[in-house]
Amino acid sequence: MSVKRSVSEIEIESVQDQPSVAVGSFFKGFRAPSDTTFDLYKKKKSEKDEFVLHGENERLEYEGYTDSSSQASNQYVVGLFNPEKKSIQLYKAPVLVSKVVSKSSKNLRGPKIKSKSDTRPSALRNALGEAFGTKKAKKAIADLERNRIDSDKLTDSAIDIVDSVRTASKDLPTRAQLDEITSNDRPTPLANIDATDVEQIYPIESIIPKKELQFIRVSSILKEADKEKKLELFPYQNNSKYVAKKLDSLTQPSQMTKLQLLYYLSLLLGVYENRRVNNKTKLLERLNSPPEILVDGILSRFTVIKPGQFGRSKDRSYFIDPQNEDKILCYILAIIMHLDNFIVEITPLAHELNLKPSKVVSLFRVLGAIVKGATVAQAEAFGIPKSTAASYKIATMKVPFKLPEMTRRGRGPRR
């Protein structure tokens, strides 16, 4: 026999979007005693509708929380049906996953409370040992107590120690002062770490003092047409390929500053190649009449005056130690950076200075230069075969500039 089915149309009278009722979902259901009270709480700062249900009576507690995973995928409503109008009112009703907990089974143990007694367990143990222990045990307890440090008695001593340390360390340099001392001890010209252009990293006045720069007069070199006669006006005659090649490109009055740098470079090369000379008079004999103020400035910055030497400055003795040798070389490289527009080939320069390329690379890195294999564009500019470009080292300067840290190395072969 078939079952007859009827279909009724029900009108949705209203829908309440804001939660106005909540449904507690208890496993297998339950029947709450009449003395049970329930409270519903909502999290104020939560963007979602999150609720907490709490109820209790004399023996039981009821706890419920909004199921966030279920809430994200499902939406629950409670419908209030009006049979006369055949309409229904829908109320949003979050479901709270709930459970019943017996008060007798809850762990109501509170935090551990420290004993008010100041007696240490070891003190109690020692008291028993002194009362009932052997002579050997009593002696060990007495030695232990005699050597025990009482922190309370050390409070005043600790204050005195701190005051003594402060007094002793007040004259020690600060971190900034130590950085300044380290910077001054570097073998490089004074660097401008805030430079926004590569020319500002080692400005010319940090390489050649302004007072000395004005004594480098190169107008006669600029006016001279014959190249050999031009080279004869430089302070050191060593047939430098670099000086001769660079001189060909400095022919305009606007290049006067670079010509002054080239002149000073020639003088530094002369001092470096005669670094075993230990007397100013002998040094001047090997140079081509440079202004004496330039020589005095170089000797004051790049040499160590021998102790016990008195008399005229022209006759004084000095020596150039390994640190000052590196300092002269760093100044030479800084000048060459300016002359070569801050892109320098390592190999020809190493031949010019009679140094190993690795030594030149390490000095450039002390200056903060970046040393890498030549790029395709650089290889084309310098006429380097593409097959060897990656191993052909080029030194460049870039901004922002970071001053490299100085590291101490063990003594070893210099070159």
Curated annotation (Swiss-Prot):
Biological process per Gene Ontology, one example term: transcription elongation by RNA polymerase I
Q: Name one GO cellular component term.
A: RNA polymerase I complex
Family statement drawn from the similarity comment of this UniProt entry:
Belongs to the eukaryotic RPA49/POLR1E RNA polymerase subunit family.
Q: How does this protein assemble?
A: Component of the RNA polymerase I (Pol I) complex consisting of 14 subunits: RPA135, RPA190, RPC40, RPA14, RPB5, RPO26, RPA43, RPB8, RPA12, RPB10, RPC19, RPC10, RPA49 and RPA34. The complex is composed of a horseshoe-shaped core containing ten subunits (RPA135, RPA190, RPB5, RPO26, RPB8, RPB10, RPC10, RPA12, RPC19 and RPC40) where RPA135 and RPA190 form the DNA-binding cleft. Outside of the core, RPA14 and RPA43 form the stalk that mediates interactions with transcription initiation factors and newly synthesized RNA.
Outcome, altering residue 393 to A: Loss of DNA binding
Q: Which UniProt keywords apply?
A: DNA-binding, DNA-directed RNA polymerase, Nucleotidyltransferase, Nucleus, Phosphoprotein, Ribosome biogenesis, Transcription, Transferase
- Chief location: nucleus
An annotated Gene Ontology molecular function: DNA binding
Give residue numbers for the modification (Phosphoserine): 34, 151
InterPro entries under this entry? RNA_pol-assoc_fac_A49-like
* Pfam families assigned to the protein according to its UniProt record, in alphabetical order: RNA_pol_I_A49
Interaction with DNA: annotated span:
322-415
Gene coding for it: RPA49
Organism from which the protein derives: Saccharomyces cerevisiae (strain ATCC 204508 / S288c) (Baker's yeast)
Query: Which domain of life does this protein belong to?
Result: Eukaryota
Compartment(s) where it occurs, according to its Swiss-Prot or TrEMBL record: Nucleus, Nucleolus
Under which name does UniProt file this protein?
Answer: DNA-directed RNA polymerase I subunit RPA49
Keyword Nucleus assigned to the entry: answer is: yes
What does this protein's UniProt record list under function?
Answer: DNA-dependent RNA polymerases catalyze the transcription of DNA into RNA using the four ribonucleoside triphosphates as substrates. Component of RNA polymerase I (Pol I) which synthesizes ribosomal RNA precursors. Besides, RNA polymerase I has intrinsic RNA cleavage activity. The heterodimer formed by RPA34 and RPA49 stimulates transcript elongation by Pol I. Subunit RPA49 can bind both single-stranded and double-stranded DNA.
